């Protein structure tokens, strides 16, 4: 049994660990800001934005993926909502936001969602959140907040 475990561990390490094989014929349907006509309140400035009045994000943030010490791709994403109130007396008892995701172009370990936090710039409350994606590839990511969902597709190139 120990021999089998060592063989499995060796194959995992030799294969690149987290990097599972993608489907080479797959074309990632990356979400573009132009697919959306949403314009947030003027105080947020020019886009590119994606979403609805109740939940939106900034498209250019999807392009910044760094690797952490374990080899996961970790973006910091900002999420916005016209209904979000950052003051402590209005914080919901449940989570502000949860994020789920799945790889579209091949097998992968699951996305890891840490937590969402409130954030604030003068007159502009928002939510920050981090996810850990175990592999490069084509990912569908969905934010869930107060019954609203927002889904987009990104391609992470190693």
Predicted regions and their residues:
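Contiguous segments within soluble domain cores/interaction surfaces
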Residues: 20-134, 138-158
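N-terminal secretory signal peptides that target proteins for export/translocation
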Residues: 1-2
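Bacterial N-terminal signal peptides
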Residues: 5-15
